[in-house]
Amino acid sequence: LFSSADFHIQTAPVCSKGSVHLTAGPISRKPRMGRLQVRENLGISEQVPMVLITMGGIPKHHGFIDQLANQNEVFFVAPGAVTGFQALGNVILLPHRSDFFHPDLVNAADAVVGKVGYSTLAEVYHAQIPYGYIKRTRFQESEILSEYIGNHMAGFAIDERIFEDGDWILRVPELLDQPSVTREDPNGAEAAADFVLKLLNGDAG
């Protein structure tokens, strides 16, 4: 199917590079709501650091929730962990399907901790915040995505066992202190749309 197309677009990170007409940057959904409004809806002050714990849309109950209280100067938001909105001190648990748009949560956070996946990577990339990323050994693309994070984004890798045990929580201050990566490149979706528009106008080939 790929080879039968007349024009080819790939988006970074690319797992299998080929001869293409355009390699665009990471493509992510844009936030719908401003950072301050999202934090207000969550009940989190702008002055308080917020860390988003995400498994990329997969419902997941975390066994380390109680340990998050040890970092009481930081608010943690974990989607997919419960059936309804819960506020437990400095921890906010959200249901798998909530009123909060995932890119909005990423944009409202100061750092993200979660599994390596394309959509989360792209959202964190454009939010320009640190990423504590969990490699998934059973997924072939995990190594390529992790390499891209290491070369283009702030943050560090977290072993799956360390994540599940909650030992990573001690490194939250280190994650928040990571220097931000400032960039002005457009969302890959815009670059791809511009390319298609030029094709329709007869300006690309």
Question: Can you annotate each of these PLM segments?
Answer:
Residues D167-G205:
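C-terminal amphipathic helix plus adjacent low-complexity
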Residues L1-K30:
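Active-site-proximal region of nucleotide-activated glycan assembly enzymes
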Residues R29-A111:
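Donor-nucleotide binding loops and adjacent catalytic segments primarily
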Residues K17, K60-H61, T120-L121:
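Short glycine-rich, flexible loops that bind phosphorylated cofactors or substrates
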Residues L93-H96, H126, P130-E174:
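Nucleotide-sugar donor-binding patch of glycosyltransferase catalytic domains
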Residues F7-I9, L22-A24, V77, I92-L94, ...:
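Hydrophobic/aromatic beta-strand patches that form the interior of the parallel beta-sheet core
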Residues F101-I144:
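A donor-sugar binding/catalytic signature common to diverse glycosyltransferases
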Residues P13, G56, G117:
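Short glycine-/small-residue-rich Rossmann-like dinucleotide-binding loops
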